[in-house]
């Protein structure tokens, strides 16, 4: 099931960006397809570090394909999360809205994330939600 979920997500992104006419689309398309394979293999092999590397690389590729995917505030939030509370971050959603997806460091609670965001980034209306999807894998 994980393979299907991630293949669907990444391949939908590939379609969107390939059709956008962006000069970086072809490179992004190729890299995201490779990344999809790496991500699926990381789940199959229970390789948490590689999984996180794939998520982080995904975010970088999205920003490369379209600078509109992020801005300085989102980049700062992502960098701070990676430093203090998360092992991986990426963005999800559509233009004008969305959310920052984070794979939390071991032992970090959702309350700690909420407090961290409120203190370090008070301009962000945080509605942190915790979804435990990978417990059975790791």
What are these regions (language model features)?
Residues 1-91, 101-138:
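C-terminal nucleotide
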Residues 95-97:
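Glycine-rich nucleotide-binding loop
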């Amino acid at each position: 099931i994980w393979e299907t979920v991630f293949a669907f997500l990444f391949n939908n992104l590939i379609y969107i960006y390939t059709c956008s006419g962006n000069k970086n689309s072809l490179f992004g398309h190729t890299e995201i397809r490779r990344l999809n394979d790496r991500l699926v293999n990381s789940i199959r092999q229970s390789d948490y570090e590689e999984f996180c590397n794939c998520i982080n690389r995904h975010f970088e590729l999205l920003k490369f394909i379209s600078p509109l995917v992020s801005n300085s505030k989102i980049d700062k939030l992502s960098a701070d999360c990676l430093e203090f509370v998360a092992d991986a971050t990426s963005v999800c959603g559509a233009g004008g809205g969305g959310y920052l997806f984070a794979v939390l460091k071991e032992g970090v609670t959702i309350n700690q994330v909420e407090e961290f965001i409120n203190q370090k980034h008070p301009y962000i209306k945080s509605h942190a939600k915790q979804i435990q999807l990978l417990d059975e894998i790791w």
